[in-house]
Structure formats: C-alpha cells, structure tokens
Amino acid sequence: MLTRRQIILGSGLALCAGLSGFGSAVAAASAPRVVAIDWAAAEAMLSFGIVPVGLSDTSFYRQRMAAPVLPETVVDVGPFWEINLEALAALKPDFVIATDYNLVMTPRIADVARVALVPSITTPNVERYQLAIEILNRVANLCGVSPSVPSSVVEAAERRFAKARETVSKHKYAVGVMLPDIGGREMTMYGEGTLPDAVLRKLALSNVWSGPVNGTGMARVGLDQLVESADAAFLVVDIPSQRLQTERSLQQNTMWKLLRPVRDGRVAWLNQFHPFGGVPSAAHLADLIASALENMA
C-alpha cells in the first residue's frame, strides 16, 4: 500500500530553469533523473527540454508520438502494465512519474523509487485539453521548471491551432477520428471527453460521433452506425504493427466500401498520433487534421 511519503516528492530536486518552447535544451547536470511511465508526462518533459532517463515501452512510444523526439539514450523499463523493476532500480531515478492507474497495474514501483503522480486521462469532470494543460503544469512543477515554460508550450500550441483552424475553415465536413479493429468490422470512435474531440472543437469542426461513450470518451461501434455520416471525413488512427492487416480487412469489407466518405475518397490515416497524449500531441493532431482535409479538397 502506498504511503504519502512514497508518492510525494521530497525536497531538493534540481531546478531546470531557463527553458523556452518545445524541446529546449537543458544542461544534464541541472535536470532531475526521472523515469516516466505515463507518456503524456514524458511528452511534457521533452517539450521542456528535459530527457527522462527511462520510459515505459520506448519502441512503441516512438511509433506513436511524433514530437518532441525521444532520444535513443532513454532506457526502456518495460510496458506500463508490467514495469521491469530491476531495470527501474538500476537507473536510480530521483523519482518516477506515473498515474494512479499505473500504480494499480504495477504497485511495487513505489518499493523501488519515489513516485510522483500526475492526473490520469480518466480524471472526471475536467475538459480533456484542460487536463492536458494540467499534466503539463504538474510535470513542470515536479521538475522545478519555471511556470513560464509550460505557458510557452501552450502558447506555441495555440498558434498551431489557429493556423490549422484557418486551413480547415473552408471545409464543411464533420470529422470522425476512429481506430479500426484488425478485422475491419468495428471502429473505436473518439467522442466527447477525448483528445481528438477537444482538438476538433479547437478547430471549430464537428465530431462525427456524438453518441454514447465510455469512461474514457470512446465508443466501439459497428460500421452500420456510420452510414448516416455521408458528409464527413474519416481520419483513421494508424497502429504501424497492424496497418497492413487492417487495410486489407477494410478493403475486403463491403460495408466499409459502401460508406459515402470512403466512396468519395475522404479517408486519411493519422500517423504517429497517440490519443492519450498531452498538449504537444494535441498540436500535432491539429496539424494532421489540417493537412488531411486540405488534401481532400
């Protein structure tokens, strides 16, 4: 069982001042040794120019998270649901950044290192993009970073939202952000409460899926539930390891091929996007959506 001492950081963490923008350089000596289990927290660190010494599932992170780029020096400590405690201990981190969900999956993390909690994406009653900002600010506070640094990251993201909003302003399509199952028969739709929905709102675009969702804002639906989305654009989340099989399954699915957006060529794949990311992921998604819709014109 976790104690307050285990989950709250002690004093004396080195300050990481003098940073600005996405991924600014910071002297290694001035940064704490941090292992990030939560990817949104890792993304936040990198946007401050702080490189974690360890991260959960580095290979998959690089497939899903475009920028800031994760350096090759970062040690993989295993998947978030089964952290390699020996690898974690060997890194001798000042602390580990995780969510309460991570601790449920691997509670013994706290036996190895001090743990600092960041908000989970399932935090209730918080708008999803605002939650991303809260994660950014929390990570900055943990790392001793000046509040002006996360503010500059948010400002940079807002500029990208504005540019993307201008690009898509001439498009009248509702947008469906979706993840197909590998068999191509069902879609996970990202509805209210998800990062894709928050970004669509930032871009003044309607979300195709306004139906019921689960606690994380997603809904698993059959293709027949997308028939009425005639005037829409479908943006498909790319999982690299599944892409070929998924495309093959969709191409062989008659219902998919009969959907109006598919027939009219209004389908694009979203590369290197992780729907559980933070502010940098939101800005990246805005760029992807703008590019996809512009190419459909």
Please place each PLM-identified region on the residue numbering.
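Structured C-terminal subdomain patch of bacterial secreted/periplasmic proteins
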Residues: 33, 131-134, 229-297
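Short helix-initiation/N-cap motifs at beta->coil->alpha
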Residues: 77-85, 213-223
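A short, structured surface patch at a secondary-structure boundary
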Residues: 33, 39-87
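N-terminal export signals
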Residues: 6-26
